[in-house]
C-alpha cells in the first residue's frame, strides 16, 4: 500500500487516488475507530440517559463498521473470499 497523491477533507481523511481498496478501507477503519472512541468519551459527559443510549448505540454501530472493513481486508468472512 504505497502512498499516493492526496488531499485532506474536513474529517482529516485523505482523498486517496489509489484503486487498491485496502488503502481506502485502512483509512476508513482509522476514522471509524477515532470517532467511536470520541463518542464513548462523550457518553461520560452526558447526563441525559436517552442521549447516552444514543451515543452508546452510535459507538457500537461504528465498531461494527470497523470490524466489517477489517474482515474485508483480511478476507476472514466467506463473502470476502
Where are these regions (language model features)?
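Short, charged, amphipathic alpha-helical segments
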Residues: 49-60
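Generic alpha-helix initiation/capping and coil-helix boundary signal
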Residues: 14, 18, 44, 51-52
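Secondary-structure edge/capping motif, primarily at the C-terminal ends of alpha-helices
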Residues: 39-50, 73-76, 80
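N-terminal acidic leader/helix
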Residues: 3-37
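Amphipathic alpha-helical coiled-coil segments
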Residues: 62-76
Amino acid at each position: 500500500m504505497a502512498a499516493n497523491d492526496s488531499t485532506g477533507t474536513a474529517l482529516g481523511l485523505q482523498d486517496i487516488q489509489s484503486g487498491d481498496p485496502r488503502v481506502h478501507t485502512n483509512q476508513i477503519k482509522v476514522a471509524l475507530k477515532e470517532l467511536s472512541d470520541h463518542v464513548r468519551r462523550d457518553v461520560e459527559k452526558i447526563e441525559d440517559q436517552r442521549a447516552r443510549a444514543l451515543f452508546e448505540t452510535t459507538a457500537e454501530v461504528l465498531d461494527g463498521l470497523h470490524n466489517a472493513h477489517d474482515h474485508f481486508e483480511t478476507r476472514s468472512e466467506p463473502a470476502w473470499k
